[in-house]
Amino acid sequence: MPLRLEIKRKLAQRSERVKSVDLHPTEPWILASLYSGTLCIWNYQTQVMAKSFEVTELPVRSAKFVARKQWVVAGADDMYIRVYNYNTMDKVKVFEAHSDYIRCVAVHPTLPYVLSSSDDMLIKLWDWEKGWACTQIFEGHSHYVMQVTFNPKDTNTFASASLDRTIKIWNLGSPDPNFTLDAHQKGVNCVDYFTGGDKPYLITGSDDHTAKVWDYQTKSCVQTLEGHTHNVSAVCFHPELPIIITGSEDGTVRIWHATTYRLENTLNYGLERVWAIGYIKSSRRVVIGYDEGTIMVKLGREIPVASMDNTGKIIWAKHNEIQTANIKSIGADYEVTDGERLPLSVKELGTCDLYPQSLKHNPNGRFVVVCGDGEYIIYTALAWRNRSFGSGLEFVWSSEGECAVRESSSKIKIFSKNFQEKRSIRPTFSAEKIFGGTLLAMCSSDFICFYDWAECRLIQRIDVTVKNLYWADSGDLVAIASDTSFYILKFNRDLVTSHFDSGRPTEEEGVEDAFEVLHENDERVRTGIWVGDCFIYNNSSWKLNYCVGGEVTTMYHLDRPMYLLGYLASQSRVFLVDKEFNVIGYTLLLSLIEYKTLVMRGDLDKASEILPTIPKDQHNSVAHFLESRGMIEDALEIATDPDYRFELAIQLGRLEIAQEIAVEVQSESKWKQLGELAMSSGKLQMAEECMKYAMDLSGLLLLYSSLGDAEGVTKLATLAKEQGKNNVAFLCLFMLGKLEDCLQLLVESNRIPEAALMARSYLPSKVSEIVALWRKDLSKVNSKAAESLADPEEYSNLFEDWQVALSVEAKAVETRGVYTGAKDYPSHADKSSMTLVEAFRNLQVEEEESLENGDMDHEEVVAEENGNEQRNEDDVAEHVEEHHEEKEAEEEEGIVDGDSTDGAVLVNGSEADEEWGTNNEGNPSA
């Protein structure tokens, strides 16, 4: 029966003719040496060229990674070997190695050796720890030496293939070959060793269009592989799969079964002749070099063939070898750490007659079924004895121990617990997959049908593309995984039973409401298991998650691909296995799962009884779960993390609890958040305290100003000044009427122009003092601009109502320290829009009216006022006449006044030059 290997193309890159290929053991890189003389490193994950080296203008026929040194070593037709550091791109070494074309280089797996073979019929050994000295020469071939390769089972020996039609086996340290195989009728192009431990085989490819498998112990030909129509240029035994791969100049790659030597598959990607095949251990990736580019394919799935029963006994298959280990064999004194490999004692259990592609325990763990090569064999788990066998593409167990076999897409057989055939089913559709469990499931490409095991009656058809299916042990829940998401369904067993008991006919789609969709999650499930009502799975990002009631929790981020084996309740751990069969455990408390399950079922009383058994360090996980269920009060009681409890308290509006947490944590952001919430909730005392802790001075300003708290504003002004919050300090002082302090603050903050403007508006008596400071400060930058500043004491005519402003200041200083209460607002509301100058003028009018009402002798007042008015009129007339004369003089001299110079002030009869103005000559000033 065929292997049915799934083959996926992972990379396709066109290029010049590819003469050799190699895979990096740790990086996602392919090394290709080209006939054009270039080395290319392709990243097969990103599908782009990562690096390239221009080696020579002649063909580079062979190149290999030396990962432990971060090197690439290459041999070319110019007879030189070159070594590059692929990280720094530096050339490490260049030396002439042969007297003719270099056909192949091979790197020793552990020692600092490189073998090279050439058209000069020689093989040379190079030691890079001795400065790339040639430590040995192997002579014996009578034609070109096309390839050399080390024996992976004995790295002291190597094989060479030559166009003299022979294969020679050599020992390092001996110049003569151990023996020679007359391999083919024409030249031998390639040779490779079998990597498994059970067969002393090697394979050769020749210009006679055949590949041959040899036993190098008996020196006999085991098998000849015929089918290619041109020279066989590349061969390999796959290190992980039981297959042989051959490539030919006929453009095809053929895959052969390594045991039966049957042709399994033929690949033809239309890139002309095949020249090279590359692979690495522990990977199912194979890279192929063609005339027109490079192809990488992935053969089969990389999921390890392993199974664990409910007692912790693990059985896995390495090729045809079956091994076992028991988790419980680890001593109780050993402290298991999450994510670390378990030190299991591995034992050989036996071998399998077919190549295992799947392996699974039955529900009680007594039997193990192995599937592969289109057959299945049932073994006893303890002694590994053959219990039953047969033909089948797939094999599944029922939850009761029965089983089903899919022999083809149109025939499924069901067997009893004793492996006796019960019935045969021929579905009305093409069954591409089957799944076991509580019900028997059959899938086509776009739907799945569930049947009962007893009579194979249709339960329900569901239109979904199914990749995998996982049943809970209870049989009430099932997870259906597709390529992009998974669904949790509830199986209504009682409804189905009552339907069949009633004798009602079943519809074409099955029993209505047999399944109820509970949850859908947009994550791809790689592997999964059920523990109670908890579904544990790892996703496409290799996160280990579990899902209870639709709420997904990430347990761990896996650092490499791992696959779920099972769960042991006695250890509260879930176990996984990687591709190298390392077993790793992670803690998942059963009490935690039970608690979440009970909450989902609404049994809160029983859940509260289990809560004390959950360790404190898991309480936050419980709280997050409760929050997702809308049980925020319960989450607040259980949560232990202060930050999380604070957020929950804020959600609930429990400000007192939030305040206690804030006192404990002393986080400025928390105090600020709590202060804003307290303010909006009307808890002003709490808001004040929070804002003080948070140093939220702006918030305190809003609070104190809203409350009319002069004492608070006074303290805030001092605090703001200490903290350097000058804006807040200024507003506080201004609200308190401490204008001199405001002015001083502006000066100290080096805001002298603003201080001058404020003094002009509120403290005109201080203007001269501030202008002097301004001139002094500005003169350091622009002396002309400093000279242009006008002092109102010197040029009062340029400042409207200057004398009135001085009088207003003297009058206003009496009321500045008086803070009117909020209750008096109505009597002051009408005056709020009146300026001080207007108020002063109104005051003058009121005084005049009071004088007219008899406070003084009317005639004396009138006489005095007339005298004053006369003097004022004379002064005004004199001032107007002087101003008129000055204006005429200015017009004669061509001087423009201040109003016509965009506000520039005249000093000593000339316009002051400003930084952005013009000089006296009309040119732009510096």
From Swiss-Prot:
Sequence ranges of Acidic residues compositional bias: 888-900
One BP term from GO: intracellular protein transport
Coiled coil start-end: none
SUPFAM superfamilies hit by this protein: WD40 repeat-like (SSF50978)
InterPro entries attached to this UniProt entry: Beta-prop_COPA/B_2nd, Coatomer_complex_subunit, COPB2, G-protein_beta_WD-40_rep, TPR_COPA_B, WD40/YVTN_repeat-like_dom_sf, WD40_repeat_dom_sf, WD40_rpt
Task performed by this protein: The coatomer is a cytosolic protein complex that binds to dilysine motifs and reversibly associates with Golgi non-clathrin-coated vesicles, which further mediate biosynthetic protein transport from the ER, via the Golgi up to the trans Golgi network. Coatomer complex is required for budding from Golgi membranes, and is essential for the retrograde Golgi-to-ER transport of dilysine-tagged proteins.
UniProt name for this protein: Coatomer subunit beta'-2
Organism expressing this protein natively: Arabidopsis thaliana (Mouse-ear cress)
